Amino acid sequence: MAVLYGAAAANAFNVSPPVKSSPGEHGGNIRSLTDTVTYATQTTSDTIVIGGGLLPVGARVLEVIMTTSVTTGSATLALGITGTVAKYKAAGAVTTANVPQVFGLAAALNVPLTAPEQLFLTIAGASLPASGTLVVTVLYVVD
């Protein structure tokens, strides 16, 4: 039976000399950017800026967690930045109420940011519900 390694494990255990893991791979302090959105029939093509600050240079996003109090129905949400509106979450409905759902596009995860990022949600498909809340949490490391 073969012994296989993920990229970080290969660097740490299967090369000589070992390569130091990044904070996103081992030992990093996880930080969060969290915001709450109150639904009020926000319409398609609207954007909702989230977070009390920017993701800093060097941050490595690990995952995005969304929890909604009501289903978004036909409304879809994407999470991204200017120029890449679906960088962290492709447009999709959040259809299970009160159950945290984890998102993250693999190409954008554990990649150090070269510039600060302001995150926003983009609405498509239909308007958001008339009432309820959405909590968005972005977990990242920067050390």
Task: List where the protein language model places each region.
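Surface-exposed, low-hydrophobicity beta-strand/loop segments enriched in small/polar/acidic residues
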Residues: 2-143
